[in-house]
A protein has these predicted regions:
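Active-site PLP attachment segment
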Residues: 71, 303-338
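N-terminal basic, amphipathic alpha-helical segments
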Residues: 1-141, 334, 344-351, 359-362, ...
Length: 467
């Protein structure tokens, strides 16, 4: 027997022996079908009455933990093993609701891993970012907490940060608004979901660019909406193809995801006229608009929104780092309170400390300096990448002016080309993964985290594989 028991004075001997054997079985020190000492041998070893051992064995046998085998002895039963297996077999399943059933349908994620050359999408160069923001930010205001800070701030977010964002979007995106028009969020995904929860009923029709950002489609489908898709041309979303009765359309006018181009001014105005006539809402995801490399900074769709039908959403994850989890939205004035109230019901959890930190960073000028510095770094990668893509005959680069990735149409099957490159240690991504109706056949090259020297080495491989 793999233990020796030292009895404690004042405690019942039989109970101590029972507990030792019982725990030994539960903890695996006494295994299924292991033979136990006879009552005579164990009583002699422990120096206790044989009747005490007999009573303990009888109790354990009654409970099913040990068994007697005639002419053989006493053994640990397999009761524990059966209990564990039974637990595994009898996992109880519950009926999911509509939202739970929809959420169980996980979207496909394409992400080749552990390749030496990865043109991954949507990830900034955090090595240059995280230490920069923490080094230059001060938390001096935490030493003198105002009631707003101490109680979590306004439903729309801290006033001071909304003031800073107000200045930022005015200078960089041409959007004239007041701090009262801005709602702080955890980022674009939360902004989209909150908007949909506020405005949609099951069965409503929403539309999106095709190819386009899958998160919007997935969230709308989760809530029971019908999904309409709208093809793109080189000017932007084809307005005349927007399905009738569309209640909300999701767009990325400044840097279309995933094709990378910007909407023309004429197409923006056409889209705004459509929304006014159809009493529809446009979600403008200001995706990657912070980065532009051809001395052109186009104004946001929201800046031309005279009829208050655009919900502009933005995030600081690409400028700083995703873990900061701060974004913003600028909805029509009539929707500010309903959306803010919905955020409250969802457990508004944008960190007050992070909001203070970001506000300090912006007010002290570090934000604009950092953005300028990152534009220089990304601009070098952008120009090198455009040059290398243009040197490959089977790639036709889609003109873009900024962002953190470039798209190139291919002659042939983009997915097959991707697979060839992945097998050669280079990760690129086909635009078809973001399309419902296969409206696109392009390869996507993200350059947020891949430095220029690695871009050049990767294209040596790409050229040899594709040519």
């Amino acid at each position: 027997m793999p233990f020796s028991l030292h009895f404690e004075t004042g405690k019942v001997t039989s109970q101590q022996l029972y507990s030792e054997i019982y725990q030994g079985i539960l903890e695996g020190r006494l295994r299924s079908n292991e033979r136990l000492p006879s009552t005579r041998m164990l009583s002699k070893k422990l120096g206790i009455a044989r009747n005490t051992v007999i009573s303990v064995y009888e109790r354990l046998q009654f409970e099913g933990w040990i068994v007697k085998k005639a002419g053989s002895g006493t053994y640990v039963s397999n009761a524990l093993e059966q209990t564990v297996n039974q637990d595994k077999r009898s996992i109880k399943h519950y009926q999911l609701g509509v939202f739970g059933t929809n959420a169980a349908k996980k979207p496909e994620i394409i992400a080749p891993k552990n390749l030496d050359y990865d043109f991954t999408l949507g990830v900034p160069d955090h090595q240059r970012i995280a230490k920069h923001i923490w080094r230059h930010s001060r938390l001096s205001r935490l030493n003198a907490l105002t009631p707003e800070f101490a109680h979590g701030g306004d439903l729309q977010g801290l006033t001071c940060l909304r003031e800073s964002i107000c200045e930022y979007v005015r200078h960089s995106r041409g959007v004239i608004c007041d701090p009262e028009d801005i709602i702080i969020t955890q980022g674009c995904q939360q902004a989209i979901m909150t908007t949909l929860l506020t405005l949609l009923s099951p069965g409503d029709l929403v539309s999106t660019e095709d190819p386009g950002y899958p998160v919007f489609r997935n969230q709308a489908r989760l809530l029971g909406a019908q999904i309409g898709t709208v093809p793109m041309d080189d000017q932007g979303v084809v307005v005349e193809s927007i399905p009738s009765n569309t209640k909300i359309i999701y767009t990325t006018p400044s840097h279309q995801f995933p094709l990378g181009f910007s909407y023309s001014v004429e197409r923006k105005l056409e889209l705004l006229r459509w929304a006014e006539v159809n009493n529809a809402i446009i979600i403008e995801d200001d995706y990657d608009a912070e980065y532009h490399y051809l001395n052109t900074s186009k104004q946001a769709l929201k800046s031309q929104d005279k009829n208050d039908c655009v919900i502009m959403i933005g995030s600081f994850s690409k400028i700083l780092f995703p873990g900061l989890r701060i974004g913003y939205m600028i909805p029509p004035k009539s929707l500010i309170d309903p959306i803010s109230n919905m955020l409250w019901h969802l457990g508004r959890s944008t960190s007050v400390v992070s909001q203070i930190l970001l506000d300090e960073f912006m007010r002290d000028g570090h934000f604009s300096h950092h953005l300028l510095n990152m534009n220089k770094i990304y601009s070098e990668r952008y120009h090198k990448l455009t040059q290398l893509i243009d040197n490959i005959d089977c790639l036709q680069r889609i003109p873009s002016q900024g962002g953190l990735h470039i798209a190139a149409e291919v002659s042939g099957c983009a997915t097959q080309m991707m697979n060839k490159l992945v097998s050669s240690n280079v990760a690129v991504y086909p635009s078809s993964h973001f399309s419902i109706n296969n409206h696109s056949n392009a390869l996507l090259f993200g350059f947020g985290i891949i430095p220029t020297p690695k871009i050049e080495k990767a294209f040596d491989i790409i050229q040899s594989v594709l040519d």
